[in-house]
């Protein structure tokens, strides 16, 4: 492609609303443009990268026997009503009505649609297992789109679905898909970890997320410093043990704590450590109220609360709800004397507290000398807190450390969640009706482009891995007015293309400095500069990743380029 004829609108300044490196550079280098909040146009360079990523995904999906199809983004509400998610999915589901007042959704995912298709077409065990996938536009009405392609309202996704007659068959496909995902991310050059995860609104039990390591990641990964263990922080179990003090129980007393609302403030006021405090948080759990207790230096984990209570929706109560239910403000809550309508559950660490401190359900007052069991009842003790750095690793090897990650892939064992709800059944070998067992597997394709850009960039611009780069070689002349340089560049533009390389030829009448700056910004793996030694048949090759430069005779250019791109 000749750059003089290409649409590559680069920017010299960083856009004011671009917060993270990938967003800034993809805008500046002319790969994307924002069309609305959370909605982006892929310009020609961005589209080429997107197509490279999609090609890798297709190769790995086809290798494990998955078959590609294409489903509509516009989905009838009836399908979502059959699964129950029309009511439970929340405001992220984009809903609309047609001119006949019929309800539709713009799909954030396609479990309902694919289940209905397979339900209507597959009637016998002889057609199973079946693995289908698509690469499709998805929609999610994010409350706060941010970080460019990393959290948008319209995005590209690869979603695959598998249907089985047995859990063993599902396990085999799940493992195949897991390995295919690892291959995809390795081929994209990424530094990633597969972590144990929560299934969220999709449902199901066993699930893993694939996280690209990045300081701007919205997810925290808890990993062992001595093994391969890794989990999303929401799912990492706490295996720490707590020893109860042999200190004799003290008298329960109510004391004034005027203006002290946080654990840190109360602990400082009473001259105790936060570990002696009991933090009380009121949650609305599927319409009922639950008071969750954790130690003062710990944080309550809503995902664990949801899983322990087998709940669908868990939300922290609003200040208004808290006042109405507890007759006290948030900063003064405690488990002593609560209404029978409020269930009290506690983290295991709370059981070991002796002579602790908790809110008195009265503004400006706390109890001291608090002892669980004696002073208040707990309906259930469970692991309800987030793991902390330094906690023992759940696999018994080493201790927990934290890293940040960008989720780019997720694999689920759905079981019969959707097939039961939507009556996706088949006849087995004995003619008996059985429910299909399902798995689903997603990759955020446009998010993956941003994650690659986030990991592969420097102070000058993007540094694309060869596998996904928009072009292999950026060819340019140092002196646009030199007939000798232009003639050699034209000759090798043709020859490199004939040798199978994808070449962007900067034939613009610009100064060398402008061309070099744009080349570094765009980030093509190799830059070939036809300069002062053109008359000798020698060009300069620069490796974008390392900055290394080589003077190469044009007779060796093809072999040199192949070697450098493969290294």
UniProtKB/Swiss-Prot annotation:
Cytoplasm in keyword set: yes
Enzyme Commission numbers on file: 6.1.1.15
Compartment annotation: Cytoplasm
Any one GO cellular component localisation term in the record: cytosol
Keywords: Aminoacyl-tRNA synthetase, ATP-binding, Cytoplasm, Ligase, Nucleotide-binding, Protein biosynthesis
Alphabetical list of InterPro entries matching this protein: aa-tRNA-synt_IIb, aa-tRNA-synth_II, aa-tRNA-synth_II/BPL/LPL, Anticodon-bd, Anticodon-bd_dom_sf, Pro-tRNA-ligase_IIa, Pro-tRNA-synth_IIa_bac-type, Pro-tRNA-Synthase_IIa_type1
Gene Ontology terms, MF aspect: aminoacyl-tRNA deacylase activity; ATP binding; catalytic activity, acting on a protein; proline-tRNA ligase activity; transferase activity
Enzyme kind, highest EC tier: ligase
Catalytic activity entry: tRNA(Pro) + L-proline + ATP = L-prolyl-tRNA(Pro) + AMP + diphosphate
GO biological process: prolyl-tRNA aminoacylation
Pfam families xrefs: HGTP_anticodon, tRNA-synt_2b, tRNA_edit
Record text on subunit structure and interactions: Homodimer.
Annotated HAMAP family: Pro_tRNA_synth_type1
Sequence similarity: Belongs to the class-II aminoacyl-tRNA synthetase family. ProS type 1 subfamily.
Function in brief: Catalyzes the attachment of proline to tRNA(Pro) in a two-step reaction: proline is first activated by ATP to form Pro-AMP and then transferred to the acceptor end of tRNA(Pro). As ProRS can inadvertently accommodate and process non-cognate amino acids such as alanine and cysteine, to avoid such errors it has two additional distinct editing activities against alanine. One activity is designated as 'pretransfer' editing and involves the tRNA(Pro)-independent hydrolysis of activated Ala-AMP.
Domain notes: Consists of three domains: the N-terminal catalytic domain, the editing domain and the C-terminal anticodon-binding domain.
Protein name: Proline--tRNA ligase
Organism: Geobacillus kaustophilus (strain HTA426)
